[in-house]
C-alpha cells in the first residue's frame, strides 16, 4: 500500500516584521497569493498556487532573533521544477533579486536565490538552457546583470 501521495507544503519560520517582505517576495517571484489560514495561536500567512496553499509562513521567531546564517535543521534548500527560464531570469533582474545560475549538460538550467529570511531556493528548468546566461558547466554568482 502506498501512503505517500505527493508534496503538500513547505513551512518557513520568521519574525512578525518579516511577513510583509515574504508575502511580497513570493508574490513577485512565483505569483503566489495570500489565502485562507486557520486561526493558529501565532501570526502567519499561507501562500497559494491556485487553490493549493504550498507555502506556510509562521511568525515564530521573536523580533530581531533571526540570523541569515543560522542553520535550523538539516534542510539545505528547497527545489522547484520550473519552466520559462528566460522570462524567469528577466523577472528576477527586474525585481533586483540576486541569484546564481548554471547550465548543466543533459540536466538543464538552474537558478539559486534566497528569500527575505534566508531560505535557499533552487529552480530547475529541466529541458532548458540559457546560453547567454552562463557557459555550460559553470556557475555565475550574485547575478543582477
Residues of each region from the PLM?
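Conserved beta-strand in the GNAT
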Residues: 56-58, 122
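Acetyl-CoA-dependent GNAT
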Residues: 59-62, 126
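Vicinal oxygen chelate
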Residues: 1-3, 7-16, 48, 66-145, ...
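Core segments of cupin and vicinal oxygen chelate
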Residues: 12-54
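Short acidic/glycine-enriched loop/turn segments that link adjacent beta-strands
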Residues: 39-44, 74, 105-109
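A short, acidic/glycine-rich surface segment
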Residues: 42, 62-67, 99, 131-132
Amino acid at each position: 500500500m502506498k501512503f505517500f501521495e505527493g508534496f503538500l507544503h513547505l513551512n518557513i519560520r520568521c519574525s512578525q516584521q518579516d511577513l510583509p517582505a515574504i508575502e511580497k517576495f513570493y508574490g513577485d517571484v512565483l505569483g503566489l497569493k495570500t489565502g485562507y489560514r486557520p486561526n493558529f495561536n501565532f501570526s502567519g500567512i499561507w501562500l497559494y498556487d491556485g487553490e493549493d496553499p504550498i507555502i506556510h509562513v509562521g511568525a515564530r521567531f521573536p523580533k530581531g532573533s533571526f540570523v541569515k546564517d543560522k542553520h535550523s535543521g538539516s534542510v539545505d534548500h528547497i527545489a522547484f521544477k520550473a519552466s520559462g527560464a528566460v522570462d524567469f531570469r528577466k523577472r528576477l533582474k527586474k525585481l533586483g533579486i540576486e541569484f546564481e545560475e548554471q547550465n548543466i549538460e543533459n540536466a538543464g538550467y538552474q537558478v539559486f536565490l534566497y528569500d527575505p529570511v534566508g531560505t535557499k531556493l533552487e529552480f530547475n528548468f529541466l529541458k532548458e538552457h540559457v546560453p547567454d546566461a552562463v557557459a555550460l558547466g559553470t556557475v555565475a554568482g550574485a547575478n543582477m546583470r
